[in-house]
């Protein structure tokens, strides 16, 4: 049995990756409908060798008959249009932050809390977590189940693709100018030069000094893990890498767990690849995660501050597992559980 699938934001980075991932994972698509903004109307995209013309969202659209809609068109579009799709009986899987903290909308990472997917029926919407949260909780969950986790301190090293097409252009243009000895072009996306630099600034700052991105990692983790007591302190940094977010994670556990035990539970965890042989220079890197759907974990060691505790290094492709792949996995889960 196949499904009628819509993609909203089809021409963007994540939207195009939805198409790739649906094809690679052989999701049973019977019909495909592509939506984007008016400026992208009429563009042609390819799926499984067939061309599809992009439509603009407008009030005349009827969404009846569509089974699943994958949204990645920004929060305002999701706020306006996701309920309209849901009203027509469509299950919406939304990649924006618009619905993540809504108590009636499940926030799902299939390797971590698949049981929550059934709760979509309240509003017809399932939220995809933030990219940096997804890879962190996939790596934390096996350790949480084995030893419990009280608190986490995480520093992220996030690729520019997480900030969109203009951010990618900034890094390309600035790097080219620097290499050619030319004047550095004005940044389109970032407040400062990103090439050969690091910006401890992702999303807006709040009065307490934390950013919105850093708060997402706290509140989304609590919701996904069903644990309001877990503490997360994050520092999120944008670095001059095109694809692949990296995270340095230290955690205090409830019970003692050795690095060897942690490696073992992580090796057996779904969606995780352990690469942890630093003596031979083997550890996760963004370049190795690019184009992959797994979360890579390495540098697993006893933490020197938290007792008991562990430290580790976690890397994933932010556009795939951090966005498109996770959404498609949610769709697969809906099919597997017979929920659509």
From Swiss-Prot:
Disulfide links within the chain: none
GO molecular function, one term: NADP binding
Annotated binding of phosphate, by residue: 100, 216
Pathway the protein acts in: Amino-acid biosynthesis; L-lysine biosynthesis via DAP pathway; (S)-tetrahydrodipicolinate from L-aspartate: step 2/4; Amino-acid biosynthesis; L-methionine biosynthesis via de novo pathway; L-homoserine from L-aspartate: step 2/3; Amino-acid biosynthesis; L-threonine biosynthesis; L-threonine from L-aspartate: step 2/5
PROSITE patterns to which the protein is assigned, alphabetical: ASD
Highest taxon, organism lineage: Bacteria
GO biological process, one term: 'de novo' L-methionine biosynthetic process
Name of this protein: Aspartate-semialdehyde dehydrogenase
Species whose genome carries this gene: Aquifex aeolicus (strain VF5)
């Amino acid at each position: 049995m196949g499904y009628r699938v819509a993609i909203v934001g089809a021409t963007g980075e994540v939207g195009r990756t939805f198409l790739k991932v649906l094809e690679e994972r052989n999701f049973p698509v019977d019909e495909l409908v592509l939506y984007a903004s008016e400026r992208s109307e009429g563009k042609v995209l390819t799926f499984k060798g067939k061309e599809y013309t992009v439509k603009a969202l407008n009030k005349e659209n009827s969404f009846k008959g569509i089974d699943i809609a994958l949204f990645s068109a920004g929060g305002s579009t999701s706020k306006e249009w996701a309920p309209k799709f849901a009203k027509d009986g469509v299950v919406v899987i939304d990649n924006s932050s618009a619905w993540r903290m809504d108590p009636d909308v499940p926030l799902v990472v299939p390797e971590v809390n698949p049981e929550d997917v059934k709760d979509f029926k309240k509003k017809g919407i399932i939220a995809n977590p933030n990219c940096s949260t997804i890879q962190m909780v996939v790596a934390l969950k096996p350790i949480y189940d084995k030893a419990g986790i009280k608190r986490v301190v995480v520093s992220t090293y996030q690729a520019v693709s997480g900030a969109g097409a203009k951010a990618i252009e900034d890094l390309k243009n600035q790097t080219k100018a620097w290499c050619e000895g030319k004047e550095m072009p004005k940044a389109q996306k970032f407040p400062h030069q990103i090439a050969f630099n690091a910006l401890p600034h992702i999303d807006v700052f709040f009065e307490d000094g934390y950013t919105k991105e850093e708060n997402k990692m706290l509140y989304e983790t609590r919701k996904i893990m069903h644990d309001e007591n877990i503490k997360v302190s994050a520092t999120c940094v944008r670095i001059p890498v095109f694809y692949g977010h990296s995270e340095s994670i230290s955690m205090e556990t409830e019970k003692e767990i050795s690095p060897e035990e942690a490696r073992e539970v992580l090796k057996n965890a779904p969606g995780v690849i352990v690469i942890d042989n630093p003596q031979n220079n083997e550890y996760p890197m963004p370049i190795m995660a690019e184009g992959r759907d797994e979360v890579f974990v390495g540098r697993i060691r006893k933490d020197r501050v938290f007792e008991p505790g562990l430290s580790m290094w976690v890397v994933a492709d932010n556009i795939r597992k951090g966005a498109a792949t996770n959404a498609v996995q949610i769709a697969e889960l809906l099919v597997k559980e017979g929920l659509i």
